[in-house]
């Protein structure tokens, strides 16, 4: 029997923000997945840090990962992480009743014409889920509390109740009920494209449940089982008795056995596919990285078939901290002197999450043939 649900009103600024997200047209809706994956990664960081001083924190689940499950039949996209999870008070406070300091600032920025993709910088990235979903449920289990489920269709209120259905062990499961006009976000290819673009260098495995097909060899009678069942059902429905010729039974059976043939059928199955196998080598010490590793990373970053000509890998510490990994390609780009071309090819990341690849202030225009990342 489902537990009694408590209803809470969204804090005024949050309700206003959600209304803005739902009722304004944004073309860049795909950032919702980047934000939810970033939140999942933060939750995984937290449990990992806690486990460094108290390894028993991982007794509720040692494997740290993020899993994406699209379900076209139900029209849902599920994001699961085995991170720190949320207590009941976390769900109530963090997802609705206490506005983060960035809520108002973000709304002001939006109204001033800022891009929706900046939402994560203001600490309210979770609400971007409502760009593509008309209902969201968040089931969460923290080591210090029972499992609870948060639910809202963004109508000014949300509910929280205890959940005894499917134990998570530890972590969070977010189910997005995708809007009818946004179902392309349930396509495997679309999800892979977004993860590859925005979350390729997240420090935990991102697994996608994919549907595949394989060939299976079966004997004719296995393949015909369903047909037999249908015939038997038909006979039961008619009044005519079944006439058997018992005299030739043994001979017929022997012939059947000899004549049994194998046939190949196609069967569908699902399995997890890891989407972020390329690791962010710029976070490592340059002394530990071989030229081959730089070469492989350069090719995966740029889709160039040739090795790079030169590489510069450095970090800056102080008031502003960043790491940079810059490559000079072996060949001059064919459009080097075109005015209309993209101003630079440096990708900007913040904590391994892709932000943009057109930040003109990163390098001067005359160096726009360089490729690389700044994090």
UniProtKB/Swiss-Prot annotation:
SUPFAM superfamilies: ATPase domain of HSP90 chaperone/DNA topoisomerase II/histidine kinase (SSF55874), Ribosomal protein S5 domain 2-like (SSF54211). Residues 213-263 are annotated as: Disordered. GO terms for molecular function: ATP binding; ATP hydrolysis activity; ATP-dependent protein folding chaperone; insulin receptor binding; TPR domain binding; unfolded protein binding. GO terms for cellular component: centrosome; endoplasmic reticulum chaperone complex; perinuclear region of cytoplasm; polytene chromosome interband; protein folding chaperone complex. Residues 225-245 have a biased composition (Basic and acidic residues). Keywords: ATP-binding, Chaperone, Cytoplasm, Nucleotide-binding, Stress response. InterPro entries: HATPase_C_sf, Heat_shock_protein_90_CS, Hsp90_fam, Hsp90_N, Ribosomal_Su5_D2-typ_SF. It is found in: Cytoplasm. Pfam families: HATPase_c_3, HSP90. The keyword ATP-binding applies. ATP binds at residues 39, 81, 100, 126. One of its GO terms (biological process) is centrosome cycle. Molecular chaperone that promotes the maturation, structural maintenance and proper regulation of specific target proteins involved for instance in cell cycle control and signal transduction. Undergoes a functional cycle that is linked to its ATPase activity. This cycle probably induces conformational changes in the client proteins, thereby causing their activation. Interacts dynamically with various co-chaperones that modulate its substrate recognition, ATPase cycle and chaperone function. Required for piRNA biogenesis by facilitating loading of piRNAs into PIWI proteins. Homodimer. Interacts with shu. Belongs to the heat shock protein 90 family. This is Heat shock protein 83.
């Amino acid at each position: 029997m489902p537990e009694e649900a408590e209803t809470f009103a969204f804090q005024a600024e949050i309700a206003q923000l959600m209304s803005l997200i739902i009722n304004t047209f944004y073309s860049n809706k795909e950032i919702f997945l980047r934000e939810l994956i970033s939140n999942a990664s933060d939750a995984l960081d937290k449990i990992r840090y806690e486990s460094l001083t108290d390894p028993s924190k991982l007794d509720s689940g040692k494997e740290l990962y993020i899993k994406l499950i699209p379900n076209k039949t139900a029209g849902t996209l599920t994001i699961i992480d085995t991170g720190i999870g949320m207590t009941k008070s976390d769900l109530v406070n963090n997802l609705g009743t206490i506005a983060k300091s960035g809520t108002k600032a973000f709304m002001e920025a939006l109204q001033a014409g800022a891009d929706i993709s900046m939402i994560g910088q203001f600490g309210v990235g979770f609400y971007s889920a409502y760009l593509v979903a008309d209902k969201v449920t968040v089931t969460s289990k923290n080591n210090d509390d029972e499992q609870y489920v948060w639910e809202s269709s963004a109508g000014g209120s949300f509910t929280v109740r205890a959940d005894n259905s499917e134990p998570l062990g530890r972590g969070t499961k977010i189910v997005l009920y995708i809007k009818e006009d946004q179902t392309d976000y349930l396509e495997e290819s679309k999800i892979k494209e977004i993860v590859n673009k925005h979350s390729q260098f997240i420090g935990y495995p991102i697994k996608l449940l994919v549907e595949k097909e394989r060939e299976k060899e079966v004997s004719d009678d296995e393949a015909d089982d369903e047909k037999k069942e249908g015939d038997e059902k038909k006979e039961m429905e008619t009044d005519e008795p079944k006439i058997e010729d018992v005299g030739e039974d043994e001979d017929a059976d022997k012939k059947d056995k000899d004549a049994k043939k194998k046939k190949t059928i196609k069967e569908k199955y699902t399995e997890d596919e890891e989407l972020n196998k390329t690791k962010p080598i710029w976070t490592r010490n340059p002394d530990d990285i071989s030229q081959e590793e730089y070469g492989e990373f350069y090719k995966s970053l740029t889709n160039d078939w040739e090795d790079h000509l030169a590489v510069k890998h450095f970090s800056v510490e102080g008031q502003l901290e960043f790491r940079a990994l810059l490559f000079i390609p072996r060949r001059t780009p064919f459009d080097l002197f075109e005015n209309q071309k993209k101003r630079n090819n440096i990708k900007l990341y913040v904590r391994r999450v892709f932000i943009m690849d057109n930040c003109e202030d990163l390098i001067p225009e005359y160096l726009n043939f360089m490729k690389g990342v700044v994090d």
